[in-house]
Amino acid sequence: MYYSSGNYEAFATPKKPDGVDGKSAYLVGSGLAALSAACYLVRDAQMKGERVHVLEKDPIPGGACDGYKYQDIGYVMRGGREMDNHFECMWDLFRSIPSIEDENHTVLDEYYWLNKADPNYSLCRATVNRGEDAHTDGKFGLSDKAAMEIMKLFMTPDEGLYDKKITDFFDDEVLNSNFWMYWRTMFAFENWHSALEMKRYLQRYIHHIGGLPDFTALRFTRYNQYESMILPMVKYLEGFGVQFHYNTKVTNIAFDCAGGKKQATRIDVLHDGQEESIDLTENDLVFITNGGCVENSTLGSQNTPAPYKPEIKEGGGWDLWRKIAAQDPSFGHPDKFCYDPELSNWMSATITTLDQRIVPYIKKICKRDPFSGKVVTGGIVTVQDSGWLLSWTLNRQQQFRDQPKDQLCVWVYGLFTDKPGDFVKKPMRDCTGKEICMEWLYHIGVPEDQIEDMAANSANTVPCMMPYIDAFFMPRTAGDRPDIVPEGAVNFAFLGQFAETKRDTIFTTEYSIRTGMEAVYTLLNVDRGVPEVWGSVYDIRCLLDATVKLRDGRKITDMEMPLVGKLAMKEALKKIEGTEVEKLLKEYNVI
C-alpha cells in the first residue's frame, strides 16, 4: 500500500490482484468503515461478492451512521455528519456508488450538485439570553498569547503530545475564547481530551480555519446519514452478491502469533442465539471494527429518560477488542479509551415538531424558512449560556424521506450531561424527551408559561445517551490504537476510529472510509495509490491565511512583542522588500 495525490492515480483502474479468486473476506460490523472495506473489496480488489461476508450483531446495518423511525418512539438520529471537500478517500469511493434517488447518478454527483446549488453557511452561530444572537460575528477573539498557545501545540512533535491533555497546552486565554466555543461544540472536544488529536485537527483542517465561525467550511448530505450514505452502499454491495449476516455477534477472534507471523485462525460468533465458529486460513481475510463510539447507547422516549448504562457488555465492541488485545501487544490498548465513561459521554435528542407553534422561534434564530428544503441553520447553533452546553441544528428538511412535509426534525446535543439545566433544574441524563425539549424551548425564547404545553403537545422528543461517544478523544500514546495492518499480520486488519493511520482525524466519515481502503489495499496488494491526507498543512498559502484569520485579521506587525522583536521584524521586512515573499505576505494580509 502506498499514498498518492493527483489525478494520475485517482483516475486509474487497478488490475485484479493475484490470487484474489481464492480468497474470502469476513467483516466484523457493518458501520461505515466495514462497508467501505467491502466496497473496495468488490470494486478495486475485484473479489467475488459471494465471498464477502458482513457479520453484524444488529438487525440493520450502519453502526453509528443511523437514522430511523422507530414505530413506538419516533424519528431518531444519534448524530450527524459534517463533510469536507477534501475527504479524498470518501469521494474516491462515492464516485462509484449509485444514488438511491436516481441510479443514473452517483452519491458524489448528488452531493456535489446539492452543495453547489445550496451552499452551507450559518446566519447565527450562537445565542445567549434565551434566543438572542450572541453576535460572535465571525470573530475568534484570541489574544496574542492565546494565538501563541495554539501555535505551540501546532508545532509540537507527536512524541511531545503522548498522553497529554488539551489543558496541558491551553489556558483560559484560549478556553474562554470564541475559538474554543466554535471548536469544542463543532467537534465535541472536551478540555481534558487528547492534545495530540487536537493538533491533528488543527493541521488537518488548516485550510478551513476561516470557514469555522460561519460553517462555510462544511457540506452536508440531503437526508440523514443512514439514507444518504449507508443505504446506497448496502444496495451497491448487494448488487455484487455480498452476504449480509444480521443478528450475528462476533464474540471472539483467535490468533496465532508465533514466529513473527500473525494470523487470525478462528471467528467465534453468536448467530440468532446459537454459538458457531468459522475456521480461517491465510486466504480468509478478517476486517475487524475494534471498539465502538456508540457501544452501550440507549434511547429514551418522550416520557422516559435514556438510561445511562456504561457497563461493558460481553459480545460488544469493547469486550471483543479486550479479548483480541490480550493476545498480542500490537493489537492496542482498549482501556486507554473506555476506562471512564464520565469523560467520554454526551447526549443527543431528536425533536420532531408536530404543529406550527415552535416554527417562528426557529425562524427568528436561523433567519430562514425551515420548510424550504434548503439549508436551515447551516450547522449547529450553540447556546453559550446553557448549563448543558446545548447546541442544536436543522439540516435540510425533510431529514427523512418519509417525513411528513409539515414536520421538522431538529437535532440537539449537550456536552455536559451531569450538569443541571437552566429551566429544567436537573441533569440532562436524568431528563425525559419532553424535559429536554422544554430546556431547548426555553433557550430559543418560548415564553415560560407555554413551554411545558409545547413540549408535550407540539413536539415528540427522543433522547439518546452515548457513554463512549468521545472515547477516541481520550489522551493516548503510540501503540494504544493498533495499526490498520499490524506488523506481521497476514490475513487481518483493524478498521474504524480506533485503528491508527497517519495524519487523519477521528470522528469523521473520511477516517472510517480511509481505514477501510488502506486495509483492503494492504492485504490484497491493490496496485493503486491511496489518496494521501490533503496536504494543506504543507501549503504556505493556507498557513499564512489561517494565521491572519485566527487573529481576526490582525497583521503580524500588530503583534505585541518586546522592542528587540519589533526591531528584528522591521529589519527582516526590509530584506524582503520587492521580492516574491513580500508579495505573498501582502496578498494574504500578513503585512
PLM feature spans:
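Conserved FAD-binding subdomain of flavin-dependent enzymes
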Residues: 72-113
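Helical element adjacent to the flavin cofactor pocket in flavoenzyme catalytic cores
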Residues: 203-285, 290-291, 297, 303-304, ...
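Glycine-rich Rossmann-fold phosphate-binding loop(s) that bind the pyrophosphate
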Residues: 29-35
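Glycine-rich FAD pyrophosphate-binding loop
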Residues: 42-70
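Extreme N-terminal leader/targeting segments of oxidoreductases
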Residues: 1-25, 43-51, 550-591
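A short, Lys/Arg-enriched amphipathic alpha-helix followed by its capping loop at the start of a domain
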Residues: 37-50, 236, 240-242
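Rossmann-like flavin
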Residues: 100-207, 218-220
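C-terminal segments that line or cap access tunnels to active or ligand-binding sites in enzymes
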Residues: 207-221, 283-285, 290-515, 521-538
